[in-house]
């Protein structure tokens, strides 16, 4: 037996069927010759903008295409730390598999295969970390929303330390979450993204110098190592870009609730926190995300726009000297 979802058309206010994509089915009101303008309008959770593969969110309220914050940062901000990390990872992988490398080097075909395998070491590691990070974020969201966690995830021994340390963080700092995995947007600067969470904490408020009821932006990072520093002094796994990303989410004026309702965002503190969550424990870092950091985000956006637009037309075709011109010069 199947059930058909129905909802009120926002235009004609009549009950209509809802398509699988969350839009009102095409319908024509009684006495009209043309379909109702409400046909095809998204309702419920379908009103929440989703990130496309091209890196844009489409707002169903205004029809605007809003560039993804992460896309902007990926295209406009250098990743120097990743270059060093990738080089170190390939070197470590080679040393761990030295006997196989020696054997493979004796034949051209196997040597090429091993070279290609080494070149992809950083990709494999990123995918592995990405899967872990996604799963941990799903666990955190379930904890925040007090919803059931699938047994396959909850009983995974690799994830149990993360859950325990996250719960310890919540207890230690008396955390109350007010939003999680929320899509936010700013029409003036034409961007959108999904923030990790907003929280309140009397202990954090005292540390950061803000009212106890102030919303504090938060993010979780699962990579790197606790208390480890990179060659340039950054925390291994928590980078300045986290504050830049957070500054954009803080600047966003609108957000979408889980039922699809668009709301104005409340004031958020100019200092957020990044939870560095690892199996061996956690660290909580204050991260600046005020207007001065957001200004840096606007510069990064301009670089991203250059890289995806004008940069493609900077270098022209190679010039060739015509024979007649060559003879005249001679």
Please report, for each region that a protein language model flagged, where it lies by residue.
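Mg2+/Mn2+-dependent nuclease catalytic core
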Residues: 178, 182-309
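Short intrinsically disordered terminal tails
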Residues: 1-3, 208-211, 328-330
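Short cysteine-rich clusters marking metal-coordination/redox-active sites
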Residues: 9-12, 36
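Cys/His-rich microdomains that often coordinate metals
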Residues: 16, 40-43
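Metal-dependent nuclease catalytic cores that hydrolyze phosphodiester bonds in DNA/RNA
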Residues: 2, 44-192
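Charged phosphate-binding loop/patch that engages nucleotide di/tri-phosphates or the phosphate backbone
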Residues: 306-325
């Amino acid at each position: 037996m199947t059930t058909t979802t129905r909802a009120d058309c926002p235009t004609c206010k009549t009950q209509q069927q809802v398509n699988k994509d969350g839009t009102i089915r095409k319908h024509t009101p009684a006495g009209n010759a043309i379909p109702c303008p409400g046909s095809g309008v998204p309702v419920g959770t379908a009103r929440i903008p989703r990130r496309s593969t091209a890196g844009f969110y489409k707002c169903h309220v205004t029809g605007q295409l809003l560039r993804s914050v992460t896309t902007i940062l990926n295209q406009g901000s250098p990743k120097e730390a990743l270059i060093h990390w990738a080089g170190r990872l390939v070197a470590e992988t080679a040393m761990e598999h030295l006997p196989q490398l020696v054997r493979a080097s004796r034949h051209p075909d196997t040597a090429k295969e091993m070279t290609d395998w080494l070149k992809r070491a950083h990709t494999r590691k990123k995918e592995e970390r990405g899967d872990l990070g996604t799963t941990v974020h799903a666990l955190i969201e379930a904890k925040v929303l007090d919803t059931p966690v699938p047994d396959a995830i909850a009983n995974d021994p690799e994830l149990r330390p993360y859950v325990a340390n996250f719960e310890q963080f919540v207890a230690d700092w008396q955390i109350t979450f007010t939003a999680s995995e929320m899509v936010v947007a700013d029409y003036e600067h034409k961007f959108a993204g999904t923030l990790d969470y907003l929280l309140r904490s009397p202990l954090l408020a005292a540390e950061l110098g803000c009212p106890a009821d102030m919303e504090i932006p938060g993010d979780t990072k699962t990579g790197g190592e606790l208390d480890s520093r990179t060659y340039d002094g950054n925390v291994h796994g928590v980078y300045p870009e986290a504050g830049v990303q957070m500054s954009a989410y803080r600047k966003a004026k609108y957000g979408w609730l889980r039922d699809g309702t668009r709301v104005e965002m409340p004031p958020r503190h100019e200092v957020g926190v990044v939870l560095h969550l690892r199996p061996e424990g956690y660290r909580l870092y204050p991260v600046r995300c005020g207007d001065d950091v957001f200004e840096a985000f606007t510069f990064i956006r301009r670089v991203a726009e250059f890289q995806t637009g004008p940069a493609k037309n900077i270098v022209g075709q190679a010039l060739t000297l015509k024979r007649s011109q060559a003879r005249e010069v001679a």
